[in-house]
Amino acid sequence: MAKTKSKSSKPSSASKSQGGISKLILVLGLLTALLSSVVYFVEQNLEQFYIFDLKHLDDLSKRALAKHGEDTRAVVKHIVDELSEKNPEHVNVKEEWVFNNAGGAMGAMYIIHASVTEYLIIFGTAIGTEGHTGRHTADDYFHILSGTQLAYVPGEYAPEVYPAGSIHHLRRGDVKQYKMPEGCFALEYARGWIPPMLFFGFADGLSSTLDFPTLWDTTRITGREMINNLIKGKL
């Protein structure tokens, strides 16, 4: 009698596929858990990652204004010079101005510092703009250096008015309409989670202006500063 050949016990392609999906789900689950743990830890300890002091920025802005008055270029230089003396490894002293379109508003910015938990920029326009502040994952402080910034929230019948020397604090999660009339510039400082704010900063460029050279410059400078700060141990 001829021997009956036994069928091979190789797993079917369907079984392989199911096994691959299970492994992928497991890996994604582990990565999600790890990322959530890191985010939770950083969230509970955000204060220790900040290198800029709110009181110092306010005092510095006011001293620069008292010394240089309406010479905004000199005011900005005064601020950057002192910041670079205080934090030489984390301050970009090279003035690299780029346009910024966000929330319907348009101005220009100079990135002084960018990291995972903080950014510090000079933002403004010589001809005026207005738009949506965005709803952010960080507290945003506008130290007004020239001109007057206006802000509006639904239900009010009068604007919030922020002249030179004052601070407009946009709290994390809040949203306003804002206006920077002709010749308004501010030292803008954000502290909290910065990466999620980048989507707001890129949205207009990707969906409206399609100004890809400016998007590239913004990405290049922001990425360079964030990576350099990470390498130096600054989140």
Swiss-Prot record:
Membrane topology per the record? Single-pass membrane protein
Annotated membrane-spanning segments are 21-41
Class in the EC hierarchy, top level: isomerase
Entry's EC annotation? 5.-.-.-
Signal peptide per UniProt: none
Pathway(s) annotated for this protein in UniProt: Steroid metabolism; ergosterol biosynthesis
**Protein name per UniProt:** C-8 sterol isomerase ERG2
Gene encoding the protein: ERG2
